[in-house]
UniProtKB/Swiss-Prot annotation:
Protein name: Fumarate hydratase class II
Site, Important for catalytic activity: residue positions: E343
Keyword Lyase: yes
Gene (UniProt): fumC
GO cellular component terms attached to this protein's record: cytoplasm
Biological pathway: Carbohydrate metabolism; tricarboxylic acid cycle; (S)-malate from fumarate: step 1/1
Gene3D superfamilies per the UniProt record, alphabetical: Fumarase/aspartase (C-terminal domain) (1.10.40.30), Fumarase/aspartase (Central domain) (1.20.200.10), Fumarase/aspartase (N-terminal domain) (1.10.275.10)
Record bears the keyword Lyase: yes
Organism the protein comes from: Methanosarcina acetivorans (strain ATCC 35395 / DSM 2834 / JCM 12185 / C2A)
Superkingdom as given in the UniProt entry: Archaea
Enzyme class: lyase
Keyword annotations from UniProtKB, A to Z: Cytoplasm, Lyase, Tricarboxylic acid cycle
């Protein structure tokens, strides 16, 4: 058993070194750990500037570590070698080897080049730690040891699931949760402030500002519940299926044991997929997670759209809301302030919806025992989750928390709204109520003036019946029910 050295990351070499694979020798940069297959991918697939997300490689670290430990327990790899692979895998998980993963998203649809990138880097770093020669594949071979009992066809979908679960759990869900809490805080603060409602962009009956914002918070909560629900499918891992789902070249119960080990390492309840043919032939759990992101984007888009309309003005718009002034809004119009947080959120949501369309299309392209559209799916899902999470953080901090009400504007709209006539309809009938509205419009008077002047109702009865505060139900009860 060789001694494991305590060496800093870095080859300490310059120039080129020769590495080989089944197609022959390839020159690779001597200051990097990757090998021949990674270098071939860089040559053949240098397309655009979309790099495989680092989160995928961090997730692969968990896969390689767990597989090594399970292979050791099965007695098919020496303990020292499993320990060595696990040690380097920890460096991968921690992001210490991120610069060693240079591949583009646009590669083989199974993610084989990225799997081999991980295998080669772990192999060469492990070789370095025992004093060997980089590229020798001895004593740790990228295929025979690091990739033992595995295939790209089961490890890449597994890494996709792990990366998505971690992104959702560590970044997206917390960001949406605190945004929702801030919206609930506004709803409670403004629970009793009566405003005019709007449907079809036209005046409608009153509600309170708090009730309106409780709708935003609840819509966001429902979308967040869908995101959390999508985790259930992501917890099921394809590992153990190897090439086509049969588990060829794996020890007994390999998939179950690796999933258990990944669950232990990550703290998330990963399990083996009950049917590996479905887990590898389709990527439906990823499609579902993307659909959840789309639903969240739809909710956020509705909220942002409402806020920018309600903040329009300040003189010729609705201007019920006073939006925070983040920065000057125009290079030509002095003093102009724009709804920049809302616009940024809208663009993020549009991007997410577009990425979901790509994921859905890619998810439909599985052929027989493999869906070979893995890289585009994971790239889009992680990008959507990351941008939504970041947007929620900024939207809360600079868009929601500083919003104030223009009470005079709100009160003016309530006082002049013609839809308050709805309260009269049960008393004088729909037709007479409609006639009051038409008279108020024709004569440019208030609803009260039109009703009294037209002889439809006395002033005293009008004031008793048409009370906006009596037309909003029980706002505090509504908020209590909505938040439970």
């Amino acid at each position: 058993m060789p001694s494991i050295l305590d060496l800093p990351i870095g080859t300490g070499a310059t120039g080129k070194r020769k590495e080989s694979d089944s197609l022959g020798e390839v020159e690779v940069p001597a200051d990097h750990y990757w090998g021949a297959q990674t270098q071939r991918s860089l040559i053949h697939f240098s397309i655009g500037d979309d790099y495989m997300p680092k989160e995928v490689y961090h997730a692969y670290g968990y896969v390689k570590k767990a597989a090594a430990l399970v292979n050791e327990a099965a007695g098919i790899i020496p303990p020292w070698k499993a320990e060595l692979i696990a040690r380097v895998a920890d460096e991968v998980i921690a992001g210490k080897l991120d610069s060693e993963f240079p591949l583009y998203v646009w590669q083989t649809g199974s993610g084989t080049q990225s799997n081999m990138n991980v295998n080669e880097v772990i192999s060469n770093r492990a070789i370095q730690l025992v004093g060997g020669s980089l590229g020798s594949k001895h004593p740790v071979h990228p295929n025979d040891d690091v990739n033992m009992s595995q295939s790209s066809n089961d490890t890449f979908p597994t890494a996709m699931h792990i990366a998505t679960v971690l992104e959702f759990s560590n970044r997206l869900i917390p960001a949406v949760t605190v945004l929702e809490e801030s919206i609930w805080a506004k709803a409670r603060e403004w629970v009793d402030i009566v405003k005019i409602g709007r449907t079809h962009l036209q005046d409608a009956t009153p509600l309170t500002v708090g009730q309106e914002w409780s709708g935003y918070a609840t819509q966001l909560d429902d979308a967040l519940a869908f995101v959390k629900h999508s985790l259930r499918g992501l917890y099921r891992l394809a590992i153990g299926g190897t090439a086509v789902g049969t588990g060829i070249n794996t020890p007994p119960d390999f998939g179950e044991k690796v999933a258990d080990e990944i669950a232990r390492l990550t703290g998330h309840p990963f399990v083996t997929a009950p049917n590996k043919f479905a887990a590898q032939g389709s990527l439906d759990a990823m499609v579902t997670s993307s659909a959840a992101l789309r639903t969240l984007a739809v909710a956020l888009m509705k909220i942002a759209n409402d806020l920018q309309w309600l903040g329009s003005g300040p003189r010729s718009g609705l201007h019920e809301l006073i939006l925070p002034s983040d920065e000057p809004g125009s290079s030509i119009m002095p003093g102009k302030v724009n709804p920049t947080q809302e616009e940024a959120m809208l663009m993020v949501c549009i991007q997410v919806i577009g990425e979901d369309n790509a994921v859905a299309f890619a998810g439909s392209q599985g052929n027989f025992e493999l869906n070979a559209m893995c890289p585009i799916i994971i790239n889009n899902v992680l990008h959507s989750a990351r941008t939504l999470g970041d947007a929620c953080v900024k939207f809360r901090e600079y868009g929601i928390n500083g919003i104030m009400l223009d009470r005079s504007r709100i009160d003016k709209f309530v006082g002049t709204s013609l839809m308050l006539v709805t309260a009269l309809s049960p008393v004088i009938g729909y037709d007479k109520a409609s006639a009051i509205v038409q008279r108020a419009l024709d004569e440019n008077t208030t609803l009260r003036e039109a009703a009294v002047k037209g002889g439809f109702i006395s002033a005293e009865d009008f004031d008793r019946i048409v009370d906006p505060k009596k037309m909003v139900g029980d706002p505090r009860h509504d908020l209590k029910l909505a938040s439970e």
